[in-house]
Each structure stands twice: as structure tokens, then as C-alpha cells.
Regions:
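Acidic/hydrophobic-patterned starts of short beta strands in beta-sheet-rich repeat architectures
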Residues: 72-87, 135-142
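Short, solvent-exposed loop/turn segments at conserved positions within beta-propeller repeat blades
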Residues: 39, 92-96, 152-159
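His-enriched metal-coordination microenvironments in redox/metal-binding proteins
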Residues: 89-96, 120-122
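Beta-propeller blade repeat segments, especially FG-GAP/WD-type strand-to-loop junctions
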Residues: 94-114
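Short glycine/acidic-enriched loop and turn motifs that connect beta-strands
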Residues: 88-92, 146-149
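Beta-propeller blade termini
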Residues: 62-75, 127-134
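Short aromatic loop motif centered on NTY/YTY
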Residues: 108-167, 172-176
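Terminal domain-start segments
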Residues: 1-70, 174-176
Length: 176
């Protein structure tokens, strides 16, 4: 049996099962799953990367595994719920950042992609924090996005702080 490098390195699971990201914009009746197949490190960023082809479109999914954040919901003896940021890039000009919600089954080494929340195009993510350790159902994200008068080629300069509600079934942006 050839073990999956990503699952072995990130979760110490000796399994041939792959961690697959469901493309957020893929149709519900024909979802596209992209297996994360390679690990890379550059400039203190730790990435798991997968590539896909959908008919004529080529693209990639890149997940920042250094920002995996466990969520203490559900049954920790059998599963771990966690969030992780990932970016979808295709032949267009955008790099669309999402926050993904995942469930790792400790017995079967299956990772299920439960939900995704769009954060923005070409943002620079700072932090993902649990707001209150006693109430793990809320996260606070901090990231830089492009201002209205700013070219996308420039470094984003507008700081955004966003609160996100987490449940066993999904992610919801909290508006003030």
C-alpha cells in the first residue's frame, strides 16, 4: 500500500485516502473534488496543493496548512472539526480565497469537506482566531483586501476583521 504523503505528513495517518477539496463554485449535481497531492514550503508559508482540469479549464487549489484551526465541536473521540484557508486559481486572473470547514474521522482517516465561505480575491490572510475558548462557535478572521481605488496588482492595504459563526454543518458570516 502506498500511503498518501499529505495525510501522513499533516495528520500522521497511514492511509491511501486523499484529502480532497470540493471546488466551491462547482455544481451540486456534479461537484468537482480536487485531491491535495503535494506539500511545499516557501517564505514560512506551508502549503498543500492540488491541480484539476474541468473540461477546458485548468486550475489549482492551495491550502495553507499552517493555519489549520481545530474547532472543539462534535465528538472529539471520533472526529476533529477544523477550518483551513484555501485559494482557488484558474486560468483567469483571480486568486479566490475561501475558509473551508472540514471533518476528520479519527477511525477511518476520512476528511469530509463540509462547507466553504468566500473571503475575497487576492487577499492576504493574517489570522484565524477563536474569539472565546468557552464559545468555540465563533471565529475572528483578520486579512488585508484591496481598497476600492487600488489596482489588483498592488499589495492589499485595507484591513478587514470578520466574525464567522461555526456549526457542525457550516460557516456563516456574522454581520454587525
Amino acid at each position: 500500500v502506498k500511503y498518501d504523503d499529505v495525510m501522513l505528513a499533516l495528520f500522521s495517518f497511514k492511509t491511501d485516502k486523499q484529502w480532497q477539496i470540493q471546488l466551491p463554485e462547482s455544481p451540486a449535481n456534479k461537484p468537482i473534488f480536487v485531491p491535495l497531492t503535494e506539500l511545499k514550503q516557501a517564505d514560512n508559508v506551508h502549503l498543500a496543493i492540488g491541480h484539476y482540469q474541468d473540461e477546458f479549464e485548468l486550475g489549482s487549489v492551495t491550502l495553507d496548512y499552517s493555519k489549520i484551526t481545530p474547532i472543539n465541536l462534535g465528538n472529539p473521540e471520533h472526529e476533529m472539526l477544523f477550518v483551513a484557508p484555501f485559494v482557488v486559481a484558474n486560468q483567469g486572473s483571480g486568486n479566490f480565497w475561501y475558509l473551508g470547514l472540514f471533518r476528520l474521522n479519527n477511525q477511518t482517516a476520512d476528511i469530509r469537506h463540509i462547507d466553504s465561505l468566500l473571503l475575497g480575491d487576492r487577499i492576504k490572510l493574517n489570522t484565524i482566531d477563536i474569539i472565546d475558548p468557552l464559545n468555540v462557535s465563533q471565529l475572528k478572521l483578520s486579512y488585508w483586501q484591496h481598497g476600492e481605488q487600488q489596482a489588483m496588482a498592488q499589495t492589499p492595504n485595507q484591513l478587514v476583521e470578520q466574525n464567522i459563526a461555526v456549526s457542525l454543518t457550516g460557516l456563516t458570516q456574522i454581520t454587525h
